[in-house]
From Swiss-Prot:
Species this chain originates from: Campylobacter fetus subsp. fetus (strain 82-40)
Keywords for the protein's UniProt record, in alphabetical order: Cytoplasm, Lipid A biosynthesis, Lipid biosynthesis, Lipid metabolism, Lyase
Main location: cytoplasm
GO cellular component, one term: cytoplasm
Protein's recorded name: 3-hydroxyacyl-[acyl-carrier-protein] dehydratase FabZ
Intracellular or extracellular location(s): Cytoplasm
Record-linked InterPro entries: FabA_FabZ, FabZ, HotDog_dom_sf
E.C. code: 4.2.1.59
Matching CDD domains: FabZ (cd01288)
Alphabetized HAMAP family for the sequence: FabZ
Recorded catalytic activity of this chain's protein: a (3R)-hydroxyacyl-[ACP] = a (2E)-enoyl-[ACP] + H2O
Length: 148
């Protein structure tokens, strides 16, 4: 398990754009399971939408990307010993994104990503997001680890 303090040592994101609360499972080079608790206090709900708060799909995709970034970094560290101190993960593309159900305040948004392909510093991931085991979004993500 990786808590938010450790996550901040891996990712450069900070409030209000750090979209992972905890990593529950991580199998290096293979998969990651992480989540974010969605609350009405999220800054995004001031405008999306007043009186009918819906967590934006682009934020769900970004949360998937952050979980994928953690997976890529932790996989690159182990067993190669690569230092991630001066590295960053750049999001390269999103393919086949679909939004299936709305995400609302009070939901526990779960991210499950699996590595489809990894070559050098490029990662292709199958990302899915769930609330109460119900699929809310999915996409194929591509990212690259580069020097800062």
């Amino acid at each position: 398990m990786i808590d938010v303090v450790e996550i901040q040592k891996i990712l450069p994101h900070r409030y209000p754009f750090l979209l992972i609360d905890r990593v529950c499972e991580l199998e290096t080079g293979k998969s990651v399971y992480a989540y974010k608790n969605i609350t009405i206090a999220e800054q995004i709900f001031e405008g999306h939408f007043p009186g009918h708060p819906i967590y934006p799909g682009v934020m769900i995709i970004e949360g998937m990307a952050q979980a994928g970034g953690i997976l890529a970094f932790k996989s690159a560290e182990d067993p190669s010993g690569l230092s991630i101190e001066n590295k960053v993960v750049y999001f390269m593309s999103i393919d086949r994104a679909k939004f299936r159900n709305p995400v609302k305040p009070g939901d526990k948004l779960e991210y499950r990503l699996e590595v489809l392909k990894h070559k050098g510093n490029v990662w292709v991931l199958d990302g899915k997001a769930y609330v109460d085991d119900k699929l809310v979004a999915e996409a194929e993500l591509k990212a690259m680890i580069v020097d800062k």
